[in-house]
Structure formats: C-alpha cells, structure tokens
Amino acid sequence: MVSYKLIYFQSRGNGEIARQVFAFAGQEFIDERISKEQWAEIKNMTPFGQVPVLEVDGRQLAQSITIVRYLSKQFGISGKSSWEEAQVDALGDQFKDYRVEARPFFRAKMGFSDGDVDQLYKDLFVPAFNKMYSIFTESLKSSGSGFLVGDSLTWMDLAIAQHSADLLEADGKILDTFLEMKDHQKKIHSIPNVKKWIEKRPVTSR
C-alpha cells in the first residue's frame, strides 16, 4: 500500500488543494504541518528548499501544482482524456498568471510588503480578478455540467472553489457579478468528502 505524507506550514496556502485531492479521493495521508522553527531545521533536506513537499513511500516531490497534478492523475481527477487534461492545465496556468498579477495587492493586504492597499486593489486586483473570473465563467458555461472541464470534478474545480471561498470570507459580495462562480463554489464544497474535510480541517486564517 502506498504511503503518502504532505509537508507544509500550519495554514491552507499552497498545500490546501493537495489535501483536498486526498480528501475527495478518500485517501489516507499524513498531514504534517510544520512551524517556522521546524522549517528552518528541514529546509535543506527538501528538493528545492521550499514547501509543500509530497513524500510517496519516502520519495520526495516538490512544487505545489506539480504535486496536485501528480495526485490528480493517481486518483482520476485530472481530466478524462488527454484533451481534457490539457484544458485543465491551461486553466491552472491562467490561475497562476492571475496570482502573479494580483500578488502585490495580496502581499500588501497581508502586511508582507509596503503599498497603498486601496490603490493596488483598484489597479491590480480588480482587473486581474475580472479577467480570470470571466474566463472561468465561460468554461463553466461551455461544459454545461457545473464543472469547469468535462462532466466531472477535476483538481481545478477544487483550486478555484477554495480561492472563491477565501475571497468570499473577506468580502461576501465579491462574486455577486459572477453568480455562476458563486454557485460553483457551493457545489464543489458540498461534495460529501470535500465538505467533510473542510469541516474537520484545522482553522487557519489562510
């Protein structure tokens, strides 16, 4: 039997979607949440000096999206065909682009960097948010299934649903102009195994 361990900080962050893939699949795994002090001790023992790190029977795999894509293929939620997999990956890359574009706003908002939060919100976040959520809305309409690609859940459904939930936590009206995406978040987080995970996971700010 394969043994899985996911090593990440005591937060959702870049480790959460991998955790939700495990949860959806009903796959047991060790959810090792480390402190900053523990991170300093193990950093040099990780592949790229960063987390998350996935251990599969002791072998290490790094990079959050690579981990999620690997697990999704193992558990059948990467897309039902090579074409669907490519569509899912394209949305994943678009999501990454959005996060890069909006990063200065999020960092300033969380106090990690200086900057006028209100101005960054208007200049960076809003355009990036509107662009991405428009793209994802069109994907939902195109699939006609309630999922982003094809007729079943993929890892990108988990990723965008969690991001939508995080945004709604900060601003309950933010998806009022993207109601399809609001419904999508509710749908994904109502899936029994996902819902169960969200209810039992440690409470963290992000």
Swiss-Prot record:
It catalyses: RX + glutathione = an S-substituted glutathione + a halide anion + H(+). Glutathione binds at residues 8, 39, 43, 49-51, 63-64. InterPro entries: Glutathione-S-Trfase_C-like, Glutathione-S-Trfase_C_sf, Glutathione_S-Trfase_N, GST_C, GST_superfamily, Thioredoxin-like_sf. Residues 81-206 form the GST C-terminal domain. The gene is gst-9. Conjugation of reduced glutathione to a wide number of exogenous and endogenous hydrophobic electrophiles. Keywords: Transferase. This is Probable glutathione S-transferase 9. Belongs to the GST superfamily. Sigma family. GO terms for biological process: glutathione metabolic process. Its EC number is 2.5.1.18. GO terms for molecular function: glutathione transferase activity. It is an enzyme of class 2 (transferase). Residues 2-79 form the GST N-terminal domain. It comes from Caenorhabditis elegans. Pfam families: GST_C_3, GST_N.
